[in-house]
């Protein structure tokens, strides 16, 4: 079950394979078949998806573009839905999905969160788990910076 998870917090995060290049028709078809009431965020792992036409397609469907940090992926600060979803994979370019964000980095992300909130968006931030426990520490620090 989902014990301890608020029902309004449930949604779907869809991740595209890093070899899956842009296919607007396929994305449009897929998103058009999802229930309108289920919040959806899409994480693209191929650079070809990062363009205004795809952002417009996501906006039409109310789907969020997943803003990413780390993992050698482009960090594009774009909100396409009533909520923003940020996936923080870790800042260490030598350690995939690892490392700890600095206090300065987390303050920078807190400012982005506040900007999206000022636009009336809910913001969800996910820190990629790692064996060193950095994700938990970073999430707690970000929450403290935001006063939550």
Where are these regions (language model features)?
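Residues lining hydrophobic/aromatic ligand-binding pockets adjacent to catalytic sites
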Residues: 1-148
């Amino acid at each position: 079950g989902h014990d301890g998870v608020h029902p309004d917090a449930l949604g779907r995060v869809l991740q595209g394979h890093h070899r899956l290049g842009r296919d607007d028709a396929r994305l449009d078809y897929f998103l058009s078949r999802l229930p309108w009431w289920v919040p959806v965020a899409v994480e693209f792992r191929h650079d070809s998806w990062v363009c205004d036409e795809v952002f417009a397609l996501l906006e039409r469907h109310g789907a969020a573009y997943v803003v990413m940090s780390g993992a050698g992926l482009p960090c594009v600060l774009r909100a396409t839905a009533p909520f923003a979803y940020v996936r923080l994979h870790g800042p260490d370019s030598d350690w995939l999905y690892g490392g700890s964000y600095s206090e300065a980095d987390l303050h920078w992300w807190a400012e982005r969160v506040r900007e999206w909130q000022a636009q009336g968006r809910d913001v969800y931030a996910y820190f990629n788990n790692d064996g060193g426990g950095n994700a938990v520490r970073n999430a707690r620090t970000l929450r403290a910076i935001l006063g939550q």
